[in-house]
């Protein structure tokens, strides 16, 4: 939930 680019599907990947 840090990258604005991967906040679509990878919201729970980099919390």
Swiss-Prot record:
Q: Which domain of life is it from?
A: Eukaryota
Can you name this protein? Answer: Unknown protein 9 from 2D-page
């Amino acid at each position: 939930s840090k990258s604005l680019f991967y906040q679509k599907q990878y919201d729970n990947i980099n919390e």
